């Protein structure tokens, strides 16, 4: 309540990207250890909702979606909020500024955010160095995923080299990896949501991905053609330790008719439909992370009922505040104890 009645109005009075970076800056500030302890005290009654995927333990199924902490600056904080895992990035091989401003705006009536960020990134080398420094004092207690992408000016025919470079930097740092081929804000990127490209990508990444093999997931767009999705699923099912993230932002025009993508409630039904499709097409053999429009435990449970093994939040976190992930876990624990919902949590 404090967030919605006091903090959110203050933050929403600020330019969106400035407010976002301000919050991330606070999480990396020298006084953060005190803040960390304060947050942790709020999570003492956080229930355990363990999930095992790819031989990896997730303390709960609620994760932070890619795009929120693009450079891993708040990595130590996320478990304090009650997240069961975090996906940082999208990280590109070389540093890049992304698209020009304005490139982020809030749409409160729609329960949405619009962005045209275009993968602003400090680059793989700098982000990897930051993670190494953080890990010197011990790895986080939650799995850390790395979302990797291509630089804007890399020709499409050289895209695989960009993914290889990123993967090589983070191979020993990330617990799992997500290949972003679906952002609407990088020219031509969505055209890579094709069976043939994914075959070539896995052929080039698999030799680098061993001892131990790290899970490699593909993030798809909410408006992907089902025939293309079916081809992607074929490729994924032929490989080991794979998965799919459903879904990225929905292409939409923003201020001044600028091209960008919507996240939040407008994605809810599209994401659910794709999750159900993938679950059916793969007979439940492919791990799914469901993203898009999760603002309540009902939304979260719908994703899991449709077939998602894990869920991620972003826009709902912005609108509901820092207590949202922990509250989601508490509500999911309550649902788990009800006869009509318990079967969903026992599918393992």
From Swiss-Prot:
It holds the Pfam family DHO_dh. Pathway: Pyrimidine metabolism; UMP biosynthesis via de novo pathway; orotate from (S)-dihydroorotate (quinone route): step 1/1. Its cofactor is FMN. Its EC number is 1.3.5.2. InterPro entries: Aldolase_TIM, DHO_dehydrogenase, Dihydroorotate_DH_1_2, Dihydroorotate_DH_2, Dihydroorotate_DH_cat, Dihydroorotate_DH_CS. The active site is at residue 183. GO terms for molecular function: dihydroorotate dehydrogenase (quinone) activity. GO terms for cellular component: cytoplasm; plasma membrane. Keywords: Cell membrane, Flavoprotein, FMN, Membrane, Oxidoreductase, Pyrimidine biosynthesis. It comes from the Bacteria. FMN binds at residues 66-70, 90, 147, 180, 219, 247, 264, 293, 314-315. Catalyzes the conversion of dihydroorotate to orotate with quinone as electron acceptor. HAMAP family: DHO_dh_type2. This is Dihydroorotate dehydrogenase (quinone).
């Amino acid at each position: 309540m404090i967030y919605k009645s006091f903090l959110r109005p203050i933050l929403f009075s600020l330019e969106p990207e400035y407010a976002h970076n301000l919050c991330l800056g606070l999480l990396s500030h020298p006084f953060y250890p005190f803040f960390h302890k304060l947050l942790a005290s709020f999570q003492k009654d956080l229930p355990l909702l363990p999930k095992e995927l790819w031989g990896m333990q997730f303390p709960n199924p609620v994760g932070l979606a890619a795009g929120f902490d693009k450079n891993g600056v708040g990595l130590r904080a996320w478990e304090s909020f009650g997240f069961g895992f975090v996906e940082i990035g999208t990280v590109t091989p070389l540093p890049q500024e992304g698209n020009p401003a304005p490139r982020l705006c809030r749409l409160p009536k729609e329960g949405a955010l619009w962005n045209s960020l275009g993968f602003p990134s400090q680059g793989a080398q700098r982000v990897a160095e930051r993670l190494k420094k953080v890990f010197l004092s011990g790895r986080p207690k939650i799995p850390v995923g790395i979302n990797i992408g291509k630089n804007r000016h890399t020709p499409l025919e050289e895209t695989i080299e960009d993914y290889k470079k990123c993967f090589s930097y983070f191979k020993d740092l990330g617990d799992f990896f997500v290949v972003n081929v679906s952002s609407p804000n990088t020219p031509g990127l969505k055209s890579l949501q094709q069976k043939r490209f994914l075959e070539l990508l896995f052929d080039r990444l698999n030799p680098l991905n061993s001892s131990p093999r790290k899970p490699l997931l593909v993030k798809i767009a909410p408006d992907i053609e089902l025939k293309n999705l079916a081809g992607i699923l074929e490729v994924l099912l032929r490989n080991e330790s794979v998965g799919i993230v459903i879904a990225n932002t929905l292409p939409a025009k923003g201020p001044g008719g600028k091209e960008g993508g919507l996240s939040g409630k407008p994605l809810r039904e599209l994401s659910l439909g794709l999750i159900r499709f993938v679950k059916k097409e793969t007979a439940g053999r492919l791990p799914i992370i469901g993203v898009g429009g999760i603002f309540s435990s009902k939304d979260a449970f719908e994703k899991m009922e449709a077939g998602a093994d894990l869920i991620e939040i972003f826009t709902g976190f912005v609108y509901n505040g820092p207590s949202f992930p922990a509250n989601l876990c508490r509500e999911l624990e309550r649902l788990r104890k009800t006869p009509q919902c318990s079967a969903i949590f026992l599918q393992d």
